[in-house]
C-alpha cells in the first residue's frame, strides 16, 4: 500500500487507510460529525478515562461480553467499573520507520476492538472499524460525567450492516466495489437515531453482497469487499444471509448488538444460524433512508442481539416516522410503544399460538428440527399458551410454485436501485442503474465474475418490468393474497391468533410478502449424527449448528411478539447451552 501513512487495522484481510502525515506519536482524529479537521492529531497511548472510577474495577462483577446485556453494561458504566472508552479504546504504536515508504502501524486494541481482532481473520464478521470510535466514546463518557445520559444504551458500542450509509470516514458498500467511496449527504436515519441515543457506531459488518440479490451461485455471507463471513459453531459454517456479519458479531460479543436489514429472511435467518435474537420489524416501522435497497415493499432495518430485551432496547431507538421514507407514515400510533416494558415473563399466558403445519409439510424440515419445535410448543403450553394446530397458510402450496414473489423483487429493484444511486452525493464509478451496476461487476476482477454470477440482475433486466409498469399491479395483488388472506394475516384472523410459530428457517417467506414482523429466538441445536451438507466450501447443516423458532404476527404487532419471545426465552435459556469452535477471550476486566 502506498501513501504517507497506512493505518492498518489487523483484522484479517480488513484494512482502513488514512492518508495523513501526522507525527510519529500522533494520528488524526477523523470525526463522524465533521468537528475535526484533517490537520488535527491526537497522541494515542496511555489515555486516562474521563470518568473517575468509583470503585476498584477488580471488585466489579463484570459480565463476560459474549453474554453481556445492555442492563449489565450500563450498570458497569454507571458504577464506574469501566467507561465507554474502555470498551473501544485504541492505542497506536509505530512498527516501521516512516521514511521507508511503506509504513505499517499496528493497532493495539482493547475490549470490543480487541475481540474483533482475535477472531475476524477466521469469521470475517467486521469489514472495518470506525476511526472515530474513541472520539465518540470519550464524548459519551464526558456526557455521563456531567450527568447527561441520552438513554439506556448511552455509550454502548454497536456494529451496523455495511449497506447502511454513514456520513463519516467508514465505507458503505453493500459488499461491492461498485459503490466503494460513494457518499450520501447525511447518515442513514437509523444511524442518526443511534448517535442521538448515545450509541457508539464502532464499525460495519460483512454481509452477502447486495443483500443476496446478485447471484444464484454465490454463498451466504460472501462479498467482494468483505470476503466470506462464517459463523462460529463449526468450521466453515454457513452464516446464512444477508446480514451474516451482524449475526456473527452479535453472537461473539464483538459489540453490544448489531443492526441488520431484511427483504426476505436476511435478519432472522442469520440470527437463527448464529444462535441469537433477530427482530424483523414491520416494513415502515424503521426508516430505510440511505439504506441500499432491493424492494420498497419488503426492505426493513432491525436489531440483532443476544437477548430479546436488548433487541427491544434497540428497536425502541430506531423505530419512528421519517419524512424521507413515506412508508413510515403508515405507523398507526403517535407514540412508539414501550418495547422494553413488553418483556414480560408471563406474556405467553392465555395467548393463542398457531402452528401452520402445512408449511412444515410442504417445505420439509428434518425430523430433529420438528421434534425440537414440538418440544418448544410444549414449553409454551406449560407457560399458559393455547396451542392451535393446523392454522395453515391456505395459499402456501401455490406460493411455493409461483414465480411472482421473485418477479416483485425484480421489478422493485429495477426502480428502487436507480432512485438510490441518484441520491448519492459522490458516485465514483457513475453507477446509475442495474445495467451499469452489472457492467461494472462483470468487468471488475475483485467481483469474482463469472464464478459468482449476476443471474438475479440478468433475470430482472431480461424481464424489464419496473414497479411502475401496468403489468406490475396484478402481480403484486397476487403476492398480497399469498401473504394476507392466504398467508399469515388470514391465519391470524380465521383462528383468532395472537401469533403463529414455525422453525425459523421456514418463517420468513410469507411475512416478507406483506411486510409483517418476525422475531426469532434460539431453540436448540442439530445433534450428533446430523448429515453434513455443503454449499461450496460452507457447511449448511451438521452437528452443533443452532436452530431457532420464529414468532410471526400481524402488522405493527412487535410489542406483542417481543413479549411472547421474551417469555419463551426466559423459560428455555437455549442460547448458553451451545458450544462454539471459536470465540474471543478478551474481556473488559482484562484491560482495566
UniProtKB/Swiss-Prot annotation:
Keywords recorded for this protein, A-Z: Glycoprotein, Hydrolase, Secreted, Signal
Enzyme kind, highest EC tier: hydrolase
Subcellular location: Secreted
Gene3D superfamilies, A to Z: Amidase signature (AS) domain (3.90.1300.10)
Signal sequence extent: 1-21
InterPro entries the UniProt entry points to: Amidase_dom, AS_sf
List of catalytic residues: 161 (charge relay system), 242 (charge relay system), 266 (acyl-ester intermediate)
Glycosylation: residue positions: 120, 217, 326, 430, 528
Major localisation: secreted
Residues binding substrate: 242, 263-266
GO cellular component: extracellular region
Family, similarity comment: Belongs to the amidase family.
Name of the molecule in the record: Putative amidase ARB_02965
Amino acid at each position: 500500500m502506498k501513501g504517507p501513512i497506512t493505518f492498518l487495522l489487523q483484522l484479517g484481510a480488513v484494512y482502513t487507510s488514512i492518508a495523513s502525515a501526522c507525527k510519529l506519536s500522533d494520528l488524526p482524529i477523523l470525526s463522524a460529525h465533521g468537528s475535526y479537521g484533517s490537520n488535527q492529531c491526537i497522541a494515542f497511548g496511555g489515555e486516562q478515562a474521563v470518568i473517575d472510577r468509583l470503585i476498584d474495577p477488580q471488585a466489579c462483577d463484570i459480565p463476560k461480553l459474549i453474554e453481556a446485556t445492555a442492563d449489565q453494561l450500563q450498570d458497569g458504566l454507571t458504577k464506574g467499573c469501566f467507561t465507554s472508552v474502555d470498551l473501544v479504546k485504541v492505542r497506536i504504536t509505530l512498527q516501521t520507520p516512516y521514511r521507508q515508504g511503506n509504513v505499517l502501524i499496528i493497532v493495539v486494541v482493547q475490549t470490543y476492538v480487541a475481540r474483533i481482532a482475535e477472531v475476524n481473520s477466521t469469521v470475517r464478521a467486521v469489514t472495518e472499524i470506525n476511526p472515530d470510535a474513541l472520539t465518540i466514546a470519550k464524548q459519551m463518557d464526558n456526557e455521563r460525567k456531567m450527568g447527561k445520559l441520552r438513554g439506556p444504551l448511552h455509550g454502548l458500542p454497536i456494529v451496523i450492516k455495511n449497506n447502511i450509509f454513514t456520513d463519516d470516514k467508514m465505507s458503505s458498500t453493500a459488499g461491492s466495489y461498485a459503490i466503494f467511496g460513494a457518499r450520501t449527504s447525511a447518515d442513514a436515519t437509523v444511524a442518526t437515531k443511534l448517535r442521538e441515543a448515545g450509541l457508539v457506531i464502532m464499525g460495519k459488518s460483512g454481509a452477502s453482497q447486495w443483500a443476496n440479490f446478485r447471484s444464484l451461485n454465490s454463498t451466504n455471507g460472501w462479498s467482494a469487499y468483505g470476503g466470506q463471513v462464517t459463523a462460529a459453531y463449526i468450521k466453515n459454517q454457513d452464516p446464512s444471509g444477508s446480514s451474516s456479519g451482524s449475526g456473527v458479531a452479535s453472537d461473539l460479543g464483538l459489540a453490544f448488538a448489531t443492526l441488520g436489514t431484511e427483504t426476505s429472511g436476511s435478519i432472522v435467518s442469520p440470527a437463527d444460524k448464529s444462535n441469537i435474537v433477530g427482530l424483523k420489524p414491520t416494513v415502515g416501522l424503521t426508516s430505510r433512508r440511505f439504506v441500499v435497497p432491493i424492494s420498497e415493499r419488503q426492505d426493513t432495518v432491525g436489531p440483532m442481539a443476544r437477548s430479546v430485551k436488548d433487541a427491544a432496547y434497540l428497536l425502541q431507538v430506531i423505530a419512528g416516522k421519517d419524512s424521507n421514507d413515506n412508508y413510515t407514515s403508515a405507523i398507526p400510533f403517535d407514540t412508539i410503544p414501550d418495547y422494553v416494558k413488553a418483556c414480560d415473563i408471563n406474556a405467553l399466558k392465555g395467548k393463542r399460538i398457531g402452528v401452520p403445519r402445512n408449511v412444515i409439510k410442504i417445505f420439509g424440515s428434518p425430523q430433529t428440527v420438528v421434534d425440537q419445535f414440538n418440544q418448544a410448543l410444549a414449553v409454551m403450553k406449560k407457560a399458559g399458551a393455547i396451542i392451535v394446530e393446523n392454522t395453515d397458510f391456505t395459499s402456501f402450496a401455490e406460493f411455493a410454485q409461483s414465480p411472482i414473489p421473485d418477479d416483485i423483487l425484480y421489478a422493485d429493484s429495477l426502480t428502487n436501485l436507480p432512485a438510490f444511486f441518484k441520491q448519492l452525493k459522490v458516485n465514483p464509478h457513475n453507477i446509475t442503474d442495474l445495467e451499469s451496476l452489472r457492467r461494472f461487476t462483470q468487468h471488475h476482477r475483485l467481483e469474482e465474475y463469472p464464478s459468482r454470477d449476476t443471474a438475479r440482475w440478468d433475470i430482472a433486466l431480461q424481464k424489464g418490468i419496473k414497479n411502475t409498469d401496468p403489468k406490475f399491479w396484478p402481480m403484486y395483488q397476487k403476492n398480497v393474497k399469498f401473504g394476507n388472506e392466504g398467508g399469515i394475516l388470514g391465519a391470524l384472523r380465521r383462528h383468532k391468533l395472537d401469533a403463529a410459530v414455525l422453525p425459523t428457517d421456514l418463517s420468513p417467506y410469507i411475512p416478507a410478502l406483506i411486510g409483517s414482523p418476525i422475531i426469532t429466538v434460539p431453540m436448540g441445536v442439530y445433534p450428533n449424527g446430523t448429515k453434513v451438507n455443503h454449499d461450496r466450501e460452507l457447511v449448511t447443516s451438521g452437528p452443533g449448528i443452532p436452530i431457532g423458532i420464529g414468532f410471526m404476527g400481524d402488522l405493527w404487532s412487535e410489542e406483542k411478539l417481543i413479549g411472547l419471545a421474551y417469555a419463551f426465552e426466559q423459560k428455555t435459556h437455549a442460547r448458553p447451552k451451545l458450544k462454539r469452535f471459536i470465540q474471543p477471550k478478551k474481556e473488559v476486566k482484562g484491560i482495566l
